[in-house]
Curated annotation (Swiss-Prot):
This is Accessory gene regulator protein B. It is found in: Cell membrane. It comes from the Bacteria. Pfam families: AgrB (PF04647). Belongs to the AgrB family. Its EC number is 3.4.-.-. The chain crosses the membrane at residues 45-65, 81-101, 108-128, 144-164, 165-185. GO terms for biological process: proteolysis; quorum sensing. Keywords: Cell membrane, Hydrolase, Membrane, Protease, Quorum sensing, Transmembrane, Transmembrane helix, Virulence. Essential for the production of a quorum sensing system signal molecule, the autoinducing peptide (AIP). This quorum sensing system is responsible for the regulation of the expression of virulence factor genes. Involved in the proteolytic processing of AgrD, the precursor of AIP. It is a multi-pass membrane protein. It comes from Staphylococcus carnosus (strain TM300). Coiled coil: none annotated. InterPro entries: AgrB.
Length: 191
């Protein structure tokens, strides 16, 4: 299935290259864009399909939205492979919300974790990687926006009912963890 999709994406990218008289770099960008789109589409189907199966769709959505609202500005660690990304996504966005709902976790524990994650976002965002470098002129704005969004979500989490408050806090915790320098070996903040 994967190889069939790769061949189809390659054919679409080549067709667009020929039709629009694009150079090799433009072709590679189109191909990468299509690969990312379809990979994310299939990953979304798998994650939300499992969320429906486990009856945690709204919980998964809540964690996902808080996570991605911050990640858009904070960036962060990526899985090493597509397969690892699927596994991590299932664990982070389906299994962890399910556990959070099923296990009675003290509210103060989640608040402390979210506060620590907020500090990590303040210290380390935006997390710059070799594959996703951030130009110098954008770093300060992204950092400020990531801190602002994380702060707003943390404050909002105090005013919404359980379990959604803890799910928003879980999203903050996950993106805070994705900022940790341990995920970026042999890299400096300069990229």
């Amino acid at each position: 299935m994967q190889k069939v999709l790769e061949r189809k994406i390659d054919a679409w990218a080549q067709a667009l290259q020929k039709r629009n008289n694009l150079d090799r770099i433009a072709y590679l960008k189109i191909k990468l864009g299509l690969e990312v789109f379809f990979n994310n589409l299939f990953k979304t189907i798998v994650v939300y399909g499992l969320a429906l199966l486990f009856h945690v769709f709204l919980y998964t959505l809540t964690v996902h939205l808080s996570y991605f609202a911050i990640r858009h500005y904070a960036h962060g660690a990526h899985a090493k492979s597509t397969f690892a990304c699927y596994i991590e996504s299932i664990i982070l966005f389906v299994i962890l919300p399910w556990i959070l709902i099923k296990v009675d976790i003290p509210q103060i524990f989640m608040i402390v974790l979210a506060a620590v994650a907020f500090i990590l976002i303040c210290l380390y965002s935006p997390a710059i990687t070799r594959k996703q470098p951030i130009p110098n002129h954008m770093r300060k704005k992204k950092k400020i926006t990531a801190i602002f969004v994380a702060g707003i979500l943390l404050i909002i989490s105090f005013f919404i009912k359980q379990p959604f408050n803890e799910l928003v806090q879980l999203g903050i915790v996950l993106i805070g963890a994705a900022q940790l320098p341990i995920f970026f070996p042999k890299q400096t903040k300069e990229g």
